[in-house]
A protein has these predicted regions:
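Flexible loop and strand-edge segments within Gram-negative outer membrane beta-barrel domains
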Residues: 26, 214-216, 234-246, 252-311, ...
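Transmembrane beta-strands of outer-membrane beta-barrel pores
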Residues: 162, 179-185, 209-213, 267-271, ...
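Extracytoplasmic beta-strand/coil segments of soluble accessory domains associated
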Residues: 72-113
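Short loop/turn motifs that connect adjacent beta-strands in outer-membrane beta-barrel proteins
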Residues: 32-34, 165-173, 199-200, 256-260, ...
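A beta-strand signature from Gram-negative outer-membrane beta-barrel systems
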Residues: 129-176
């Protein structure tokens, strides 16, 4: 009883003391309120919705953990892709999806497609992971309809996103120097630095050198028709060396939460040997290859009036290739090729309702190739797309793409020729005009669907149908003794139906992990397939 009385007495004393000081405290707090006004901030964010087309993604810590030199080494971890590797550090590395061919694959560097009008091959070994922040692979096309018209024309897409500079508080400079070495005299030094110019503007630059002699040992064994071993030895690979340098720089300006512009420069220069096949005791080939690839591209995007989004990209690329074959058993060959590319795109997206978006985009591109003849191509793309999301139960994405192509070439004597047809060789001028009109304009639709019958579990029915065209490259059309100016474009048709189940879970209390299983039926058919022989 005495303890209870003591507690009550102590409580009353505290209340009394607080009451006596309350008037003085009020005056003090009022003076603070009069002199201190906090700036008001409104923070808004949209709930991230699951993509209708779920990409395979490598980013952040995943890329850092990889013992890889180039983008091609990282893409090997994706399912459904095939890497064609011509061997060694200097070997050309190309990728295709679902065995459709490299030319049906679009590779995008910060949202702008990498091009090669000469042969359509994109060597992913030229692009280092040193400056890459994220790699995404889409089968079909990207989920977001806010994209360039050209992106709707790829049967599969790889998106390479470079690093965005991030600075710690009070720091205006980042630098990273790295030196790697390995077998076969591999040396790979690199330097990366970022400079903060202001709170919204920064510069980043990256340089890298790759050098290797490519002299790796391999087993060479020959067996006679009778089954006896003629010889079994270890040989050294020859003419597989490479010396390459890559330099990148970018100026970034993120002036709002939704708006930014970026100017980027890229340069790659290499000399390498082409080792060739080991047949009939031929240990060395005399082929050498020089590459110089440079481009400058600019990107601007912003969201206007909270409903209308605009994005524009511009690019100029200049590529040089020199090839020499010094094999003394063959006629000496030396070819030089110079490519130029001008590209512009503008894409608009309008949010009509919270569940309905529409977009439209226009792209134009000019390609020119100088060799034994001058080949020119004007290409225009026009797209319209829509996306519907009904309470996250039904998601629908539809698009249509128009592609307009006009090719021309001029020989060394300056005579100009229009590529009249991509059909069977016409016999009359009237047939030529008809075929030219039919060949230069193509329309291709695409439809993607995702249905989730219940919100209790993340079980989805996914389906898509898509058409895409692959136009012949300059080599396909005009290469000496092999080119055919009357080739039709390839028409690819894809459709797929499948189920996916996703279950998120925690590891050691951390969110972000999930278990996902897919079962898909997939079919593709390519008409008028172009095959080199």
């Amino acid at each position: 009883m005495r303890r209870l009385v003591s507690i009550l007495f102590f409580t009353l004393m505290c209340v009394a003391a607080f009451s006596q000081n309350n008037a003085a405290d009020s005056l003090y707090l009022d003076s603070i309120y009069r002199h201190l006004e906090l700036e008001e901030y409104t923070i808004t964010a949209r709930v991230k919705e699951k993509d209708i087309i779920i990409p395979q993604t490598l980013s952040g810590a995943q890329l850092k953990k990889m013992n890889a030199l180039s983008v091609a080494d990282a893409i090997r971890y994706f399912s459904g892709v095939q890497i064609k590797d011509y061997g060694g550090v200097g070997g050309i590395k190309t990728v295709n999806i679902r065995s459709m061919g490299t030319n049906h694959m679009g590779v995008y560097y910060n949202g702008v497609q990498l091009g090669n009008a000469q042969n359509g091959q994109i060597d992913l070994g030229k692009y280092s992971l040193e400056n890459i922040e994220e790699i995404q692979l889409y089968n079909g096309q990207k989920s977001d309809i806010w994209q360039s018209a050209r992106e709707f024309g790829a049967a599969g897409s790889i998106y390479l996103t470079t690093r965005r500079p991030r600075f710690e508080a009070g720091k205006a400079f980042n630098v990273k120097a790295q030196m790697r070495a390995g077998s076969f005299a591999l040396i790979n030094p690199s330097l990366l630095f970022d400079i903060r110019l202001s709170e919204t503007m920064s510069i980043t630059a990256n340089a890298e050198l790759v050098s290797s002699d490519g002299k790796y040992p391999f087993r060479y064994r020959r067996v006679t028709p009778s089954g006896e071993v003629a010889y079994d030895t270890t040989a050294i690979r020859q003419n597989g060396d490479i010396n390459a340098i890559r330099v990148e720089a970018a100026l970034n300006h993120y002036y709002s939460n939704t708006g930014f512009w970026k100017l980027q420069l890229y340069h790659y220069n290499s000399e390498r040997g082409v080792p060739g096949a080991i047949v009939n005791n031929v240990w060395r080939n005399g082929e050498r290859l020089w590459d110089r690839n440079s481009f400058v591209q600019a990107t601007w995007q912003d969201e206007l009036f909270n409903r209308w989004s605009v994005r524009a990209n511009m690019k100029y690329a200049n590529d040089y290739t020199r090839y020499i074959n010094n094999d003394d058993k063959l006629i000496r060959v030396e070819n030089q090729y110079l490519q130029q590319e001008f590209y512009f795109t503008m894409a608009h997206k309008v949010r009509i309702f919270d569940w309905w978006d529409v977009s439209a985009a226009y792209d134009v591109q000019y390609n020119q190739l100088s060799m034994f003849l001058d080949a020119h191509r004007w290409t225009h793309w026009l797209s319209a797309a829509t996306a519907i999301n009904v309470k996250n139960y039904l998601r629908l994405q539809a698009s249509v793409l128009g592609t307009f192509v006009n090719d021309a070439k001029s020989t060394n004597n300056g005579e100009a020729h229009q590529r009249e047809a991509i059909n069977a060789k016409p016999s009359t001028l009237a047939e030529q005009a008809t075929n030219a009109s039919a060949a230069s304009i193509k329309w291709t639709p695409a439809l993607f669907l995702s249905y989730r019958p219940t919100q209790l579990v993340d079980l989805r029915l996914n389906a898509f149908y898509k058409q895409s065209y692959r136009y012949p490259t300059f080599n396909d059309l005009y290469y000496t003794d092999m080119g055919n100016a009357y080739l039709k474009p390839e028409l690819a048709k894809q459709h797929s139906v499948g189920l996916s189940f996703t279950q998120p879970f925690r590891i050691a209390g951390q969110k972000g992990s999930e278990f996902r299983i897919n079962a898909d039926y997939y079919y593709n058919r390519i008409s008028d397939k172009i095959i080199a022989y």
